[in-house]
Amino acid sequence: MKIVRVTVTPIAFRDPPLLNASGIHEAFALRSIIEIESDTGYIGLGESYGDAPALAIQQQVKDQLIGLDPFNLNHLRAIVQATVAAHKPASIAGAELAPGSHASKAVSNAYSAFEVAFLDLQAHSLNVPLVDLLGGAIRDRIPFSAYLFFKYAEHIDSPYKPDSWGEALNEVQIVAQARRMIDTYGFKSIKLKAGALDPEHEVACIKALKKAFPGVPLRIDPNGNWSLETSIRMAELLGDDLQYYEDPTPGLEGMAELHTRTGLPLATNMVVTDFDEFRRSVALDSVQIVLADHHYWGGLRDTQVLAKMCQTFGLGVSMHSNSHLGISLMAMAHVAASVPNLDYACDTHYPWQEPDEEVIKGGKLPIVDGCVKIIRAPGLGLELDPDQLGKLHDQYLSCGIRQRDDVKQMQRYQPDWKTVKPRF
């Protein structure tokens, strides 16, 4: 079996005005959709970053895959490594929120984008679900958490109508957002994206959530935007309210000091983003939970390696998310299904994406009782909707965004806004 066609299609979909440590989401999120077709007629799908630096590498890699055996992942990795070495990519804007955007992650980013499509193609050719290539499913329902954000009611100079979620800047609005998430999707845990407003106010929102949803596990994620002293002060206010404390302060050393001084379980998707950082983190006891993300950890199988290392060193495992669509979510679900030590519900932005902006046939994947169910069909169990793909590609061409920049977008609201880390 040989590869005869590789297509990389950049797309854009509407993204709400969600606040974060760097600024605010732009009106559109960018992704790439990858299709790989074999000479036997099977097609594998992948979804990855759609910013210009990532796309440039993906486009260069795809031209070298024609004639390759889709089972030869070592050859794929060698092609990606050589391409990145020759390309010397620049970092993608917004990198602090998406550690996979760092130029140093270019190999793992690009390899993952194609590895998922290769594995999907392999599984189709064998007539088995993709998870069977990862050792089989330990679970077929993957738990996710309600992912809350502070947000404005609409984008400044919005190119489309406001989303249905409305403003969320105070305790009452955040509780209402959580209630809608839980009522609609059945989530059993809650995560609040923080680092955007005054820390005491964000902690007050956690307190309001605890009162409104007693017994529901809570997490807060300031994206490293609190100083060590602020993080300690907020830890004292939070007490035992949290399931885990995610990336409150920057750096491996800062996180290690915070854990020493508070004893709270710390989680990260920012200070442990590759295996070298993992080694250093273990030596320092910086974090107790690692949020995996196959998009920048080097694919589904490297994510399994990460989970095994976490098991070896007694660390918990969860999963990180960026704005994504169904191919990414289902790939995430398949690898999560194969990981024995998935200790916590995973993150997903999926509820924030509009129902008419999915690229797979059948529309958005259902989230029921807080879980995504593995599709027991060949590969990922998904097919592209060509009309929807064309629509979102046209939106990419017209939206004017080529590289995520939450700082620049925030400056449209606050002209004096600057990158400051930690801000509080």
Where are the model-predicted features located?
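Metal- or metallocofactor-binding catalytic centers and their adjacent structured scaffolds
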Residues: 37-125, 415-418, 422-424
